[in-house]
Amino acid sequence: MPGLTLGDVVPDLELDTTHGKIRLHDFVGDAYAIIFSHPADFTPVCTTELSEMAGYAGEFDKRGVKLLGFSCDDVESHKDWIKDIEAYKPGRRVGFPIVADPDREAIRQLNMIDADEKDTAGGELPNRALHIVGPDKKVKLSFLFPACTGRNMAEVLRATDALLTAARHRVATPVNWKPGERVVIPPGVSDEEAKARFPAGFETAQLPSNKCYLRFTQVD
């Protein structure tokens, strides 16, 4: 499944991890899960990223969101590297599993291959891919970064909150949205349905087109 993208079901892979063997669908279960790759252990950007993800792990746990890392290094390498990650920012613990994928099969199927990066033996390396997977095992959101650019974990958390809010309330979130701010009502929802679904009411933006498509409301 090299073209894995939004709406696709992730393959039910059997994976070797720092927490033992898992099946991907069993790991996701009835929750949301963030599966994310890094190019290699014992590298600078990856160390800062994994440290930051460890720092945010408690926030994801509060939301019932699971974390699963991926790279092509073996389990023992991951375990040794985790000591460096935890020493880099003392107090942060890497409590989530990291997949060992030395044959590159998992990262190929999950669309995590970086075409421009190779290891010293010429082997494929992962890019900085991140998929948010829903309880239905479908990809809900993806980020894709090159090896030279670290991800913003605050944005990953914000995007996760937006997805959870949209799923819970059947709304959409506008630009730069943060939890607690107003959301928008999707165009397919009539005003009559909106009144029933949002008893606190909604506000329609007055625009030159006189089209009433930009409607804001507040949800918990």
From Swiss-Prot:
Q: Which residues form the Thioredoxin domain?
A: 4-165
- The protein's superkingdom reads Eukaryota
Localized where?
Answer: Nucleus; Cytoplasm
GO BP terms: cell redox homeostasis
Gene Ontology, cellular component aspect: cytosol; mitochondrion; nucleus
What Enzyme Commission number(s) does the record list for this chain? 1.11.1.24
An example Pfam family from this entry, by short name, is AhpC-TSA
Which reaction is the catalytic activity of this chain?
A: a hydroperoxide + [thioredoxin]-dithiol = an alcohol + [thioredoxin]-disulfide + H2O
Which residues does the entry assign to the active site, renumbered to this chain? 46
InterPro entries hit by this protein: AhpC/TSA, Peroxiredoxin_AhpC-typ, Peroxiredoxin_C, PRX_1cys, Thioredoxin-like_sf, Thioredoxin_domain
Chain span(s) of sequence motif Bipartite nuclear localization signal: 195-218
| Broad class of enzyme this protein falls into | oxidoreductase
Where is it mostly found?
Answer: nucleus
Job description of the protein: Thiol-specific peroxidase that catalyzes the reduction of hydrogen peroxide and organic hydroperoxides to water and alcohols, respectively. Seems to contribute to the inhibition of germination during stress.
Additional detail: The active site is a conserved redox-active cysteine residue, the peroxidatic cysteine (C(P)), which makes the nucleophilic attack on the peroxide substrate. The peroxide oxidizes the C(P)-SH to cysteine sulfenic acid (C(P)-SOH), which then reacts with another cysteine residue, the resolving cysteine (C(R)), to form a disulfide bridge. The disulfide is subsequently reduced by an appropriate electron donor to complete the catalytic cycle. In this 1-Cys peroxiredoxin, no C(R) is present and C(P) instead forms a disulfide with a cysteine from another protein or with a small thiol molecule.
**What family does the entry list?**
Belongs to the peroxiredoxin family. Prx6 subfamily.
Q: What is this protein called?
A: 1-Cys peroxiredoxin B
Organism equals: Oryza sativa subsp. indica (Rice)
Q: What does the record give as the organism's lineage?
A: Eukaryota, Viridiplantae, Streptophyta, Embryophyta, Tracheophyta
